[in-house]
Amino acid sequence: MTRRELARMIDHTLLKPDATEAQIRQLCAEGREHGFMSVCVNPYWVPLCAELLSGTEVKVCTTIGFPLGANRSEIKAVEAEDAVARGAREVDMVINVGALKSGRRDVVLNDIRAVVSAVAGEALVKVIIETGLLTDEEKVIACQLAQEAGADFVKTSTGFGTGGATVHDIALMRRTVGAGMGVKASGGVRDLETALAMIGAGANRIGASAGVAILAGLEA
């Protein structure tokens, strides 16, 4: 795998609540320098990132219903619509985990559909299923619902919950959605070895705050 190929699989991420403007600017500078697929930031920072990355191939990615996923679908839809209007081209939404664990598949399906509809094809939708809170059976159901709702990716974790991406979960998610949907590994991917293990298991996108370090490992 070439350096560019790996960089184009990474969402260079900074979602800490105390992230400063200087840190966001640095994130975007690194995004430009290394050619990451996107920078992933909280919604407040979307306009600044869109301005800083204008004219580059680096997309702006943001979060919806983050990190708990427990808001109403209508609110998530408004968040998504606003994010796209301000320059986001990828949105990572959190499912309603409690509804899933309550057996309310209809709620989860409609929740995802609301966001897919809100972006109206102007942004990719990644669905965070928060694997650390789910049984394997629930992970499969969540992936099936995301696929049925028309999302583009399923994603392991917010990074704010228990656990993160594992090879087991990535392989399970890939088997569930097949080749036609993206799988994003996020949470605890901090080095090249882990990133390559996730890719080997079926991930075609990596969410990481350590994107620069991951690429450096390829050059070592």
UniProtKB/Swiss-Prot annotation:
Its EC number is 4.1.2.4. It holds the Pfam family DeoC. It comes from Symbiobacterium thermophilum (strain DSM 24528 / JCM 14929 / IAM 14863 / T). The keyword Cytoplasm applies. PANTHER family: DEOXYRIBOSE-PHOSPHATE ALDOLASE. One of its GO terms (cellular component) is cytoplasm. Keywords: Cytoplasm, Lyase, Schiff base. SMART domains: DeoC. The active site is at 92 (proton donor/acceptor), 155 (schiff-base intermediate with acetaldehyde), 184 (proton donor/acceptor). Its main location: cytoplasm. InterPro entries: Aldolase_TIM, DeoC, DeoC/FbaB/LacD_aldolase, DeoC_typeI. This is Deoxyribose-phosphate aldolase. It catalyses: 2-deoxy-D-ribose 5-phosphate = D-glyceraldehyde 3-phosphate + acetaldehyde. Signal peptide: none annotated. SUPFAM superfamilies: Aldolase (SSF51569). It comes from the Bacteria. Belongs to the DeoC/FbaB aldolase family. DeoC type 1 subfamily. It is found in: Cytoplasm.
